[in-house]
Design a protein with these regions (language model features):
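Short beta-strand scaffold positions
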Residues: 5, 32, 76, 95-98, ...
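Acidic, PIN/NYN-like endoribonuclease modules and their adjacent C-terminal/linker elements
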Residues: 2, 33, 106-142
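Helix-adjacent hinge/juxtasegments
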Residues: 51-77
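Alpha-helix capping/helix-boundary segments
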Residues: 10, 36, 81, 100, ...
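Acidic catalytic patch
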Residues: 67-91, 98-103
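A short glycine/serine-rich beta->alpha loop
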Residues: 26-30, 87-93
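Short, well-structured N-terminal submotif of metal-dependent ribonuclease cores
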Residues: 1-37, 47-59, 139-141
Length: 142
């Protein structure tokens, strides 16, 4: 199985939160946008600045994140991805989610691959389903 994962999936895994994706790592190949690295590291730093993480916890999370990044194919944010993210989608979608979805669309269009979209975000899951992606990870009315 080929997958595209968004930041919500990686953050739940890193933080060992309830509801983490059970199928973690059970894929042939995993893709994400280079945006993932920025979002994950910013989230860790923001949490640190709020006093919710010790220095040791930050170091552990960053080390685990880098290990995960090394196992992913991170896709460059190209002009065509930015252009597609700027266009309308069938359902409401925020900017960062639109960038993730546009990246997954570019992978499918350029490589003819069948991707499963991994997200815990129900709004992003709905948008991905509206574009015929198989979606895993989102619960509730998506």
């Amino acid at each position: 199985m080929m997958v595209y994962l968004d930041t919500s999936v990686m953050m739940r895994k890193l933080q060992r939160e309830a509801g983490s994706l059970r199928e973690w790592g059970q894929w042939e190949r995993a893709y994400s946008s280079e945006l993932l690295r920025v979002e994950v590291l910013r989230t860790i730093d923001r949490t640190r600045l709020r006093g919710a993480l010790t220095d040791r916890e930050v170091a552990d999370l960053v080390e685990k994140a880098r290990t995960i990044f090394d196992g992913l194919d991170l896709i460059e944010m190209t002009q065509s991805i930015l252009n597609r993210a700027s266009q309308s989608f069938l359902t409401p979608l925020g900017t960062l989610d639109a960038l993730h979805l546009a990246t997954a669309l570019r992978l499918v269009e350029s490589g003819g691959m069948d991707l499963t979209f991994l997200t815990h975000d129900t709004e992003l899951a709905t948008a991905a389903r509206s574009l015929n992606f198989k979606v895993q990870g989102a619960s509730g009315p998506a």
